[in-house]
């Protein structure tokens, strides 16, 4: 189906708006994936706060121009699925990485975070970023372990002092 100029402008504006509000982006090739599986991916994306769109390459190049995701322009070849993380930088990478494990024909091309291009083989860097809650829990565990260690050392010093006296 041919798109009119107004439709193309609307798509570019929509994707550009998503890119401006996104924390990271992932580009993938979805050739060979069934409609049912793509529908499942879209549903999971909505739940994870990820914007997914299959867009023509010329339109997506225009949409990301002037954003942090302009570095992805060289990856826009063949059918392009672009996913923007809106709530957590690693959400789209984690979602598409898990989907690619289940779908052998689904291929992640690259990702971008803070204007830096991340090749597909390094997608784990982005996918393994802890969420805010996970990072906070890790920090609290570190504080808890440090204070417990200090308490144990204080008790040991007190014991040593009493034994010496």
From Swiss-Prot:
Keyword Ribosomal protein on entry: yes
Protein's GO biological process: translation
GO MF term list: large ribosomal subunit rRNA binding; structural constituent of ribosome
Annotated SUPFAM superfamilies: Ribosomal protein L10-like
Gene3D superfamilies reported for this sequence: 3.30.70.1730, 6.10.250.2350
Protein family membership: Belongs to the universal ribosomal protein uL10 family.
Subunit structure: Part of the ribosomal stalk of the 50S ribosomal subunit. The N-terminus interacts with L11 and the large rRNA to form the base of the stalk. The C-terminus forms an elongated spine to which L12 dimers bind in a sequential fashion forming a multimeric L10(L12)X complex.
Name of the featured protein: Large ribosomal subunit protein uL10
Organism: Shewanella halifaxensis (strain HAW-EB4)
